[in-house]
Amino acid sequence: MPTVYGEKLVIRILYKNEKIADLKSLGFLKGDRKNIEKMLKKPNGLILISGPTGSGKSTTLYSMLQYINNKEKNIITIEEPVEYTIAGINQVNVDYKRDLTFLKGLKSILRQDRI
């Protein structure tokens, strides 16, 4: 980013070889973790996670995805970018050059069969 004093740069390092954290290892209080697990077992709904950069949003979301992942489910994500790949989950990178936006990806997902 250009500033009056010169360029400002931030570098984000992702360690692709690291294992995705288990929900138990994220430091939630036991009761909070149990509530999260209960919500994740529901057949539908929305869980919204927000926070500043570096607060653990992606780590929490990837842990949740791993928790619900099984062969009976068709889990699809739309990400910008896909930070970590999870076997068994269909992860889609947003690609504006190919006109693959979040909106178009979501519309395509909604047209798919369940499995």
Give, region by region, the residue ranges found by the protein language model.
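Switch/coupling sub-region of P-loop NTPases
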Residues: 35-47, 53, 58-115
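N-terminal "pre-motor" subdomain/linker immediately upstream of P-loop NTPase catalytic cores
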Residues: 1-55, 60
